[in-house]
Curated annotation (Swiss-Prot):
Annotated residues for binding of dimethylallyl diphosphate: 51, 84, 134, 232-234, 276
EC category: oxidoreductase
Disulfide linkage: none
Binding site for [4Fe-4S] cluster: 22, 106, 204
Protein name: 4-hydroxy-3-methylbut-2-enyl diphosphate reductase
Residues bound to (2E)-4-hydroxy-3-methylbut-2-enyl diphosphate: 51, 84, 134, 174, 232-234, 276
Pfam families referenced in this protein's UniProt entry, alphabetically: LYTB (PF02401)
GO MF annotation terms: 4 iron, 4 sulfur cluster binding; 4-hydroxy-3-methylbut-2-enyl diphosphate reductase activity; metal ion binding
Organismal lineage: Bacteria, Pseudomonadati, Pseudomonadota, Betaproteobacteria, Burkholderiales
GN (gene name): ispH
Function (record text): Catalyzes the conversion of 1-hydroxy-2-methyl-2-(E)-butenyl 4-diphosphate (HMBPP) into a mixture of isopentenyl diphosphate (IPP) and dimethylallyl diphosphate (DMAPP). Acts in the terminal step of the DOXP/MEP pathway for isoprenoid precursor biosynthesis.
EC number: 1.17.7.4
Length: 326
């Protein structure tokens, strides 16, 4: 049992709104759970379905097997692609090995993949703004055979060498800092004035909304706790947004990770959660902060999200067929 040491005596807890799960994460988790219900364990999932330890362990307990590469799944197995998306090479490998695929790629990531295909078909080279090594970035870069460049910072733009400066377009990772992405996009436009931008921002609605919510939350607090795993891009960006507002901020996987010393003397403690972090973890954090002395909890004003994405058609058909037999 956790210590009941009091370090946040009489503090107020402020909850960001919105926070936590987005529509793409809800859909991805639902796909794995529905696949398990229809076909039973094991269901193989390429990479973590979403970047959250609690979610992954919960699904593992239900029979999901998380793999790094497709060759770890037996031929003919059922495989779910994670919400981050995959390259065309991975899709080809799955088909060649006779794997039965349920695609949990977030529809907003798929939108970027379609943009890449359209831009390359028009003969343009593409600059992607994103974090090297992130699964979403690897999947998006893998939509084209060459002709793509990756930049992360304004300095990367200054050093960028392209084959055809007059025939460029750019896309972005969906979970970037809105402000950082705007700065890098601005640098691209300044260096390559004719560069074609996406028709609509590639940064997803949930990333934008959660960052905006932290910008409202942080000035009201002297500490912000961000619930999310360390490998979650959007959760890390929330911590950075709070810090840029001059507030101490910590990224935590859950209540167990709270150091009581962080709360010493704090009068107002903000709590938010990345788009892959479930609300149950937020409530556990709230309860832990109450144990440490907080006396009230208030939700900040903010957007009420109503976005929902449908399940893949193939999975929806199977569910409908099963239900019709019951």
């Amino acid at each position: 049992m956790m210590t009941a040491e009091v370090t946040a005596a009489d503090a107020e807890v402020l909850l960001a709104q919105p926070r936590g799960f987005c529509a793409g994460v809800d859909r991805a988790i639902d796909i794995v759970e529905r696949a398990l219900e229809l076909h039973g364990a094991p269901i193989y999932v390429r990479h973590e379905i979403v970047h959250n330890r609690y979610v992954v362990e919960d699904l593992r307990g239900k029979g999901a097997v998380f793999i790094d590469e497709l060759d770890q799944a037996p031929a003919g197995a059922i495989v779910v692609f994670s919400a981050h998306g995959v390259s065309q090479a991975v899709r080809g490998e799955a088909e060649a090995r006779g794997l039965r695929v349920f695609d949990a790629t977030c529809p907003l990531v798929t939108k970027v993949h379609i943009e890449v295909a359209r831009m390359r078909a028009a003969g343009r080279e593409i600059v992607m703004i994103g974090h090297k090594g992130h699964p979403e970035v690897e999947g998006t870069l893998g939509q084209a055979q060459g002709g793509m460049y990756l930049v992360e910072t304004v300095e990367d733009v200054a050093a960028l060498q392209v084959s055809d400066p007059g025939n460029l377009a750019y896309v972005t990772q969906t979970t970037l800092s809105v402000d950082d992405a705007a700065a890098v996009a601005g640098a691209l436009k300044a260096r390559f004035p004719g560069i074609v931008e996406p028709k609509k921002s590639d940064i997803c609605y949930a990333t934008q909304n959660r960052q905006d919510a932290v910008k409202l939350l942080a000035p009201e607090c002297d500490l912000v706790l961000v619930v999310g795993s360390t490998n979650s891009s959007n959760s890390n960006r929330l911590r950075e947004v709070a810090e840029r507002k001059g507030v101490a901020a910590y990224l935590i996987d859950g209540a167990h990770a709270i150091d009581p010393a962080w709360l010493q003397g704090r009068r107002s403690i903000g709590i938010t959660a990345g788009a892959s972090a479930p609300e149950v973890l937020v409530q556990q954090v709230v309860e832990r902060v109450r144990e440490l002395g907080a006396v009230s909890v208030r939700t900040m004003p903010g957007l009420e999200e109503s976005v929902a994405f449908p399940l893949p058609k193939g999975l929806s058909r199977k569910i409908a067929q099963t239900e019709s037999l019951e």
